Amino acid sequence: DDLSIEDLIKFEENESFFSGIEISKKVIRNYPYKSLGAHLIGYTSPITDNEYKILSKKGYRINDVIGRIGVEYIFENDLRGKWGGEMIEVNAAGMVQQSLGTKPSQKGNDVQLTIDLDLQLMAEEVLKDKKGGAIIAMDPRNGSIRAMASKPTFDLNFFSKEFKPEKEFNRLFYSSSKPLLNRALNAYDPGSVWKIVTALAGLETGKFPSDTLLETQPCITYGSQCFREHNDLGFGEIGYVDALRVSSNTFFYQVGYGVGVDAINKISKQLGFSQLTGIELSLQENKGLIASSDWAKKGRGWGEPGKTPWIPEDIASMSIGQFVVQVTPMQMARAYAAIANGGYLVTPHVSLAKSKDLLNQKKFKIGMNPDNLKIIRNGLREVVRAGTGASINYGSLTLP
């Protein structure tokens, strides 16, 4: 069982009077910020018997812990250090006679992250009263992750405890809310933030050029369903910038239906969707799903090929980021970074060392008309100036 510091000192001072007794010291992680950035940092746990058979050859001991997810897992080799020790001679009674030599231990290396502590604290605060969600703050110039928060979360120190309370254990591993799931890297319906993809499909195909004006309506019928405008009225005749500003559904239904599913799919791939982003935490990352006509023909992943054709209702849903579109918040942040930086896909990363390495790498250009990207930027600027996002801007945001 664990000894108090006082008992440990007394025992070590009188160690020569005891025989057949050994003090086992265990190194544990202490996380002073508890749940802050839990999914990013990750946790450690003891190695299993099967793991020990392999890891013992790398210097691990049977009671060692190993990183399981997040930074703790990715940078295990950098963080763990190496054990030292002392060889001693004892007599038949187990009494120490002399030291035969020592091998100094080596501490692990520091791993510096790109995370801004104040920004991370702010992201966690925003999510505090929410049932679930994720927030990512990324530098669009180079992909450095400044904040990454996921809710629900958990206290990292739980995994450092020798004896884990059953109630907390069950909450973490068996709760329907799945607090161990990193929602920043899991795929969901994106909703209205997807409308930039539909807009670019209209612009890049030339079917809906930059001067396009469309009549928005209370409702537009596709197939057997009436797809409504979110204000149930419409916004009159508007173009791209105003459509983004007010987040019009019926504007983007018309664009999406006009260009078709495969044009939207093509643009989405240029923006990095349906693929891993390259972040170090790729084992937690989901590629997501962007529908295509070929995907529908093959059975949509669950049906019989040829029996689940593409229908008009699908394109309406896809145009505004619902149902047949599943993307991760990280993918979305990367796509928006490409809009902001003039058309370059950056590699998201949390390691400061990787940030320096990426400076010498050639940037990947998405290959879209700069004028079209400018239209999207103008529309997004209007969102927070006088649109659906105006409530977050109290004059404190400097808009580029």
What function would you assign to each model-found segment?
Residues V90-T102, R141-V193, V197-P400:
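Beta-lactam-recognizing serine transpeptidase/beta-lactamase-like catalytic domain environment
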